[in-house]
């Protein structure tokens, strides 16, 4: 099948999905699965393999996020029902004011994003975003959009995240220099993203019922409702902060140990197990069960009801995120990404813009930032021969920032952000997609300026 035909099929799939979700109001989970099936058949994937590809796409995404979303949702619900999120938000709002609180939370997200994967970190911070927004009486999007933007920037551009690490190997870039330059460029990119998010947030966007309930702006279900007595004596700032910092610190310890300790070290396996996001969140949830619930007089049944009330909302996020993974997997298996990359490679572009444009096109066409970055690295691995070490790093970063832009409906991260922030698909495209594209182009332009200077 020709490249043009594959690209037309992929484009038609995206348009059909948007029409189904935005115009026909079809539930995104169903729409994603239906369009994935039709695109797979149209792209020539054998009928007997279509089901396997769709299951692999669902499993590939949910294998990494289901447990994290479930545990993170229960931890967040415990913190929220105890009054801890509002307690923390009130403290920082008094100290900093609303505007500086948004900036401070964005700065904290920058440092959190270095050792912690984007989806894990965002899920951990979600209850804090809700708490701050509730106290400030503003949309959680005003906090969540810059936070998610800076965390994704760090995720695609700074080791030890998989995209930049693997691309560095393919493009012969030094990991140390990549870390230093990646962080240095991510700082001004984050500043631009912060102000871009402020401009985007000047418009009011409707929130989903689930987020309205979380913000206590709509009647909650009986089992999810917060008893007034639960918040009479809310936990202190130090306790709430500890419950958020502990899983992050544990994950950081696992990441650092994998980097610094030799593979033969007897403690490495144990530290990596404890430092996995799943185990770190389980530890934090057990601590919350004791410190926020039992020690404060909640009954076992009441505690169980509160934890269980987090799961219906989490299930929606999980299913839609998994369906987004199915759509992305179908696009990858159809060969649209490889065909597009080969076509772009034939165009005589300078090396740095080529790395960015190929990666951005791959990101837009098949959804995964990591796949876009790795594919670009493989295509340009021979082209970087003869470059000096810093130039190799800059080519790597150009590919990374290409993978940052154009997050939309074929990206599982798009569904995580929009569902947690209560956005419709149309509003997600107007906010999150626009912001990631601004961040990607900003990162590339700064990288190109450095290239011209050296």
What do these predicted regions represent?
Residues 98-113, 137-156, 174-183, 187, ...:
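Alpha-helical transmembrane segments of multi-pass membrane proteins
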Residues 2-4, 180-305:
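Long, contiguous bundles of hydrophobic transmembrane helices that form the permeation core
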Residues 47-135, 297-385:
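Membrane-embedded alpha-helical segments and adjacent helix-loop junctions characteristic
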Residues 1-74, 87, 91, 95, ...:
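Hydrophobic transmembrane alpha-helices of multi-pass solute/ion transporters
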Residues 7-21, 33-41, 69-74, 108-112, ...:
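Hydrophobic core segments of alpha-helical transmembrane domains in multi-pass membrane transport
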Residues 43-45, 80-85, 95-99, 132-143, ...:
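Juxtamembrane helix-boundary/capping and inter-helix hinge elements in multi-pass membrane proteins
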Residues 177-226, 401-454:
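Juxtamembrane and boundary regions of transmembrane helices in multi-pass small-molecule transporters
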Residues 1-10, 62-68, 117-121, 184-186, ...:
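Structural signature of hydrophobic alpha-helical transmembrane segments
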């Amino acid at each position: 099948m020709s490249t043009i035909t594959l690209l037309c099929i992929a484009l038609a799939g995206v348009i059909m999905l948007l029409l189904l979700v935005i115009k026909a109001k079809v539930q995104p989970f169903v729409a994603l699965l239906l369009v994935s099936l039709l695109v797979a058949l149209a792209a020539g994937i054998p009928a007997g393999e279509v089901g396997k590809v769709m299951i692999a796409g669902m499993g590939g995404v949910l294998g990494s996020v289901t447990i994290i979303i479930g545990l993170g949702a229960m931890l967040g619900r415990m913190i929220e029902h105890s009054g801890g999120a509002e307690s923390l938000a009130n403290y920082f709002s008094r100290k900093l004011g609303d505007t500086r609180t948004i900036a401070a939370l964005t700065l904290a997200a920058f440092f959190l994003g270095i050792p912690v994967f984007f989806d894990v970190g965002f899920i951990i911070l979600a209850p804090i975003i809700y708490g701050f927004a509730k106290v400030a009486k503003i949309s959680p999007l005003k906090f969540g959009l810059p936070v998610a933007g800076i965390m994704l920037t760090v995720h695609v551009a700074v080791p030890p995240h998989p995209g930049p690490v693997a691309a560095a190997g393919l493009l012969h870039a030094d990991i140390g220099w990549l870390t230093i330059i990646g962080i240095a460029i991510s700082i001004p990119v984050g500043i631009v993203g912060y102000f871009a998010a402020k401009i985007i947030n000047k418009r009011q966007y409707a929130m989903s019922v689930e987020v309205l309930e979380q913000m206590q702006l709509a009647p909650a279900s009986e089992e999810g409702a917060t008893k007034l007595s639960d918040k009479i004596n809310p936990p202190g700032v130090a306790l709430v902060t500890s419950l958020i910092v502990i899983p992050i610190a544990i994950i950081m310890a696992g990441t650092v140990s994998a980097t610094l300790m030799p593979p033969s070290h007897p403690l490495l396996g144990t530290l990596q197990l404890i430092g996995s996001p799943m185990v770190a969140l389980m530890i934090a949830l057990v601590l919350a069960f004791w410190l926020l619930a039992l020690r404060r007089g909640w009954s076992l049944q009441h505690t169980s009801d509160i934890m269980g009330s987090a799961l219906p909302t989490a299930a929606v996020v999980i299913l839609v995120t998994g369906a987004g993974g199915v759509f992305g997997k179908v696009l990858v298996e159809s060969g649209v990404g490889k065909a597009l990359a080969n076509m772009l490679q034939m165009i005589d572009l300078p090396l740095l813009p080529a790395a960015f444009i190929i990666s951005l096109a791959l990101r837009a066409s098949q959804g995964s930032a990591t796949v876009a970055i790795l594919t670009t690295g493989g295509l340009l691995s021979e082209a970087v021969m003869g470059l000096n070490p810093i130039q190799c790093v800059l080519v790597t970063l150009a590919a990374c920032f290409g993978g940052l832009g154009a997050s939309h409906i074929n990206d599982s991260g798009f569904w995580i952000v929009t569902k947690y922030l209560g956005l419709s698909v149309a509003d997600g495209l107007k906010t999150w997609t626009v912001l990631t594209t601004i961040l990607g182009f900003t990162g590339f332009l700064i990288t190109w300026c450095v290239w011209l200077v050296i």
